[in-house]
Amino acid sequence: MTRREILLGGASITLASCAPSTRIGRATPPKPFTLTDFTLVRDGLDAPEGIASSPDGRLFISNGGGAIGVLERDGTLRQIGKALAPNGVAVDREGRVIVANMGLLNKGPGPLQRIDVATGTVETLVSELEGRQLVASNGPATARNGDIYCTHSSWGPIGNIGTTTPAGFIYRVAPDGRASIVARALRGVNGLCLDREERFVYASLTAEGRIRRWRRQADGSLIDPQDYGPQLGVVIADHQAKDIRAMPVADRAELGYCDGIAFDAAGNLWVTLPFANRIVAITPDGRKVDIVHDPEDRMLSSPTNLCWGGADLRDLYVVSRASGVVVKARTDIAGLPLANWPAA
């Protein structure tokens, strides 16, 4: 039996036990892409990871050149501040950029920062919680009432993609600046987003290859965790990044290690699978839909995060970390307007 047959066999066993957890109405699934649908937006980026958009046409891209990179409408990339370990990116209702720092990447701190792109001011929102310095802030998300949520993936080591240690958590920064942990005991928690009504917070659990959501309370706390949709592919206990990268490309295509997530306006949750070079979506009725796969690294080489932009929110931007580029495609369904955009 080949390695691929073993992986696929494991997938069939695992996926059969994961029925869709949510049925919330008739689904309008997104149309799949071909690689020719993508065009290059920016290349030459140093380890880009997160991305967010502004109604004025600018993009905010985390990369090694600064605390945040601002891609202006004329194509100029303006770096602000000093890079720590910039990772996930969001924008608050006032247009300030929220950057999570994955300190484990360079054995440094992993705080959550807020950046005023007009003045260049960089401030630290959270550097420690419950007496412990943060080292793995990963994916932030903002709500229209001023709440900020962020994932903290683990305490290390960084290379254990399939970690079986549930040491990750989600923390919240209230509008008054107070920070607290609102969800615990998560395996490799990563990307984060809210739905249209901001009733639920959704997170990708990389090590489990699935999405989980929590009901959001009036005080910002999170309750009632539920797995959302099917498992997204093969996952292996304590799977190491170096071993994943050594796998044949065809075998990596089946991996379900999920990263960035974002909703479109029809309620489809788009998910990047960086090790598989794949983007999928979970429909409102709980089905997984394949959007695009790039087995040869032509346009998508470790796609980590995505966002919508453009005047009609139909420009989908995807960060391709391994190749240091951002690419764009037009979608048939617009993206969900986030906290810094006018509500639809």
Each model region followed by its residue ranges:
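N-terminal export signals
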Residues: 5-22
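A short helix->beta-strand "capping" segment at the edge of beta-propeller domains
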Residues: 27-44
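A short beta-strand motif characteristic of beta-propeller blades
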Residues: 37-42, 76-81, 123-129, 178-183, ...
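Beta-rich, blade/repeat-based domains predominating
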Residues: 43-56, 83-109, 129-148, 154, ...
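Short loop/turn segments immediately following the C-termini of beta-strands
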Residues: 64, 102, 153-155, 206, ...
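A short loop-to-beta-strand structural motif that recurs across blades of beta-propeller domains
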Residues: 67-69, 111-113, 169-171, 210-212, ...
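Short loop/turn segments that connect beta-strands within beta-propeller blades
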Residues: 72-75, 116-120, 174-177, 217-219, ...
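Blade-level signature of beta-propeller repeat domains, shared across WD40, Kelch, NHL, RCC1
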Residues: 309-344
